Amino acid sequence: MNIAVFASGTGTTLQALIDQQTTYGYKVTLLVANRECPAIERAKQANIPTLQSKDWTEIDNALTGHHIQLIVLAGYLAIIPEWICTKWEKRIINIHPSLLPKHGGKGMYGMHVHEAVWKAGEKETGCTVHYVSAEIDSGSIIAQSVVEVKESDTPNTIAQRVQAAEKVLLPRVIGEMV
Protein backbone atom coordinates (compact mmCIF):
# COMPACT_ATOMS: atom_id res chain seq x y z
CA MET A 1 0.00 0.00 0.00
CA ASN A 2 1.41 3.39 -1.03
CA ILE A 3 1.02 6.02 1.67
CA ALA A 4 1.62 9.75 1.72
CA VAL A 5 2.65 11.25 5.04
CA PHE A 6 1.70 14.86 5.75
CA ALA A 7 3.94 16.57 8.34
CA SER A 8 4.74 20.07 9.58
CA GLY A 9 7.39 19.44 12.22
CA THR A 10 10.40 17.38 13.19
CA GLY A 11 9.25 14.23 11.44
CA THR A 12 9.83 11.79 14.29
CA THR A 13 6.53 10.06 13.54
CA LEU A 14 7.45 10.02 9.84
CA GLN A 15 10.72 8.33 10.83
CA ALA A 16 8.84 5.69 12.82
CA LEU A 17 6.64 5.04 9.77
CA ILE A 18 9.70 4.76 7.53
CA ASP A 19 11.46 2.43 9.97
CA GLN A 20 8.46 0.09 10.24
CA GLN A 21 7.18 0.06 6.65
CA THR A 22 8.74 -3.32 5.81
CA THR A 23 7.36 -4.89 9.00
CA TYR A 24 3.81 -3.77 8.27
CA GLY A 25 3.73 -4.02 4.47
CA TYR A 26 3.15 -0.42 3.42
CA LYS A 27 5.43 2.00 1.57
CA VAL A 28 5.96 5.67 2.39
CA THR A 29 5.82 6.99 -1.17
CA LEU A 30 5.47 10.76 -0.64
CA LEU A 31 5.95 13.38 2.07
CA VAL A 32 3.78 16.49 1.90
CA ALA A 33 4.76 19.46 4.08
CA ASN A 34 2.97 22.78 4.34
CA ARG A 35 6.14 24.61 5.39
CA GLU A 36 9.89 24.17 5.62
CA CYS A 37 10.50 21.62 8.39
CA PRO A 38 12.94 18.88 9.46
CA ALA A 39 10.53 16.19 8.21
CA ILE A 40 11.52 17.13 4.65
CA GLU A 41 15.17 16.28 5.32
CA ARG A 42 14.19 12.96 6.94
CA ALA A 43 12.20 12.05 3.83
CA LYS A 44 15.04 13.04 1.51
CA GLN A 45 17.50 10.92 3.53
CA ALA A 46 15.17 7.95 2.96
CA ASN A 47 14.86 8.75 -0.78
CA ILE A 48 11.18 9.61 -0.41
CA PRO A 49 9.88 12.30 -2.79
CA THR A 50 8.74 15.48 -1.06
CA LEU A 51 6.29 18.24 -1.87
CA GLN A 52 6.25 21.47 0.09
CA SER A 53 3.00 23.19 -0.82
CA LYS A 54 -0.17 24.81 0.47
CA ASP A 55 -1.87 24.51 -2.94
CA TRP A 56 -4.45 21.75 -2.52
CA THR A 57 -4.89 21.17 -6.25
CA GLU A 58 -1.13 20.65 -6.56
CA ILE A 59 -1.17 18.34 -3.54
CA ASP A 60 -4.11 16.34 -4.91
CA ASN A 61 -2.36 15.95 -8.27
CA ALA A 62 0.80 14.71 -6.51
CA LEU A 63 -1.23 12.17 -4.53
CA THR A 64 -2.75 10.84 -7.74
CA GLY A 65 0.59 10.90 -9.55
CA HIS A 66 2.26 8.85 -6.81
CA HIS A 67 -0.62 6.32 -6.74
CA ILE A 68 -1.33 7.05 -3.09
CA GLN A 69 -3.83 4.73 -1.40
CA LEU A 70 -3.75 6.24 2.10
CA ILE A 71 -2.93 9.70 3.46
CA VAL A 72 -1.46 9.75 6.98
CA LEU A 73 -1.44 13.00 8.95
CA ALA A 74 1.51 12.84 11.32
CA GLY A 75 1.95 16.18 13.04
CA TYR A 76 0.41 18.08 10.14
CA LEU A 77 -0.65 21.50 11.37
CA ALA A 78 -3.09 22.57 8.68
CA ILE A 79 -6.79 22.05 8.14
CA ILE A 80 -7.67 19.70 5.29
CA PRO A 81 -10.21 21.30 2.91
CA GLU A 82 -13.65 19.74 2.76
CA TRP A 83 -13.28 18.79 -0.92
CA ILE A 84 -10.12 16.80 -0.14
CA CYS A 85 -11.87 15.11 2.80
CA THR A 86 -14.74 14.16 0.50
CA LYS A 87 -12.57 12.99 -2.40
CA TRP A 88 -10.30 10.94 -0.12
CA GLU A 89 -13.03 9.81 2.31
CA LYS A 90 -11.94 6.84 4.46
CA ARG A 91 -8.46 7.18 2.94
CA ILE A 92 -7.13 9.91 5.26
CA ILE A 93 -6.17 9.08 8.83
CA ASN A 94 -4.76 11.21 11.64
CA ILE A 95 -2.94 10.47 14.87
CA HIS A 96 -4.18 12.71 17.70
CA PRO A 97 -2.38 12.96 21.08
CA SER A 98 -5.37 12.26 23.33
CA LEU A 99 -8.15 9.75 23.81
CA LEU A 100 -10.73 11.40 21.58
CA PRO A 101 -13.32 12.76 21.98
CA LYS A 102 -11.55 14.25 25.03
CA HIS A 103 -9.16 17.12 24.30
CA GLY A 104 -9.86 17.34 20.58
CA GLY A 105 -11.01 20.05 18.20
CA LYS A 106 -9.77 23.46 17.15
CA GLY A 107 -6.58 24.53 18.91
CA MET A 108 -6.01 21.12 20.50
CA TYR A 109 -2.69 19.96 19.10
CA GLY A 110 0.79 19.26 20.44
CA MET A 111 1.55 20.59 23.91
CA HIS A 112 -1.87 22.29 24.14
CA VAL A 113 -3.38 18.81 24.50
CA HIS A 114 -0.91 17.60 27.13
CA GLU A 115 -1.30 20.80 29.15
CA ALA A 116 -5.10 20.37 29.07
CA VAL A 117 -4.79 16.74 30.22
CA TRP A 118 -2.46 17.77 33.07
CA LYS A 119 -4.62 20.74 34.17
CA ALA A 120 -7.76 18.56 34.13
CA GLY A 121 -6.11 16.06 36.48
CA GLU A 122 -6.76 13.17 34.11
CA LYS A 123 -5.65 9.73 35.31
CA GLU A 124 -5.12 8.50 31.77
CA THR A 125 -4.58 9.88 28.31
CA GLY A 126 -3.19 8.37 25.15
CA CYS A 127 -3.46 8.66 21.42
CA THR A 128 -6.15 8.07 18.83
CA VAL A 129 -5.97 7.10 15.17
CA HIS A 130 -9.10 8.29 13.40
CA TYR A 131 -10.44 8.93 9.93
CA VAL A 132 -10.29 12.57 8.89
CA SER A 133 -13.50 14.43 8.15
CA ALA A 134 -14.27 18.09 7.49
CA GLU A 135 -14.88 18.64 11.23
CA ILE A 136 -11.65 18.73 13.25
CA ASP A 137 -10.95 15.52 15.21
CA SER A 138 -14.48 14.20 14.68
CA GLY A 139 -13.94 11.35 12.20
CA SER A 140 -14.61 7.74 13.16
CA ILE A 141 -12.12 6.33 15.66
CA ILE A 142 -10.04 3.44 14.33
CA ALA A 143 -7.86 2.65 17.36
CA GLN A 144 -6.62 4.10 20.64
CA SER A 145 -3.71 3.45 22.98
CA VAL A 146 -4.00 4.35 26.66
CA VAL A 147 -1.16 6.01 28.58
CA GLU A 148 -1.27 6.36 32.37
CA VAL A 149 -0.91 9.85 33.82
CA LYS A 150 1.21 9.72 36.98
CA GLU A 151 0.98 12.16 39.89
CA SER A 152 4.56 13.24 39.25
CA ASP A 153 3.90 13.97 35.57
CA THR A 154 4.29 17.31 33.85
CA PRO A 155 2.90 18.17 30.42
CA ASN A 156 6.36 17.35 29.01
CA THR A 157 6.56 13.87 30.54
CA ILE A 158 3.01 13.15 29.42
CA ALA A 159 3.96 14.26 25.90
CA GLN A 160 7.00 11.96 25.84
CA ARG A 161 4.98 8.87 26.74
CA VAL A 162 2.10 9.72 24.40
CA GLN A 163 4.52 10.30 21.52
CA ALA A 164 6.14 6.93 22.18
CA ALA A 165 2.69 5.29 22.09
CA GLU A 166 1.88 7.07 18.81
CA LYS A 167 4.97 5.59 17.16
CA VAL A 168 3.75 2.09 18.04
CA LEU A 169 0.04 2.52 17.32
CA LEU A 170 0.13 4.35 13.99
CA PRO A 171 2.34 1.91 12.02
CA ARG A 172 0.34 -1.02 13.43
CA VAL A 173 -2.98 0.51 12.36
CA ILE A 174 -1.65 1.20 8.86
CA GLY A 175 -0.42 -2.39 8.69
CA GLU A 176 -3.89 -3.62 9.60
CA MET A 177 -5.32 -1.54 6.74
CA VAL A 178 -2.98 -3.08 4.13
Question: What residue spans do the PLM features occupy?
Answer:
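One-carbon transfer enzymes
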Residues: 1-178
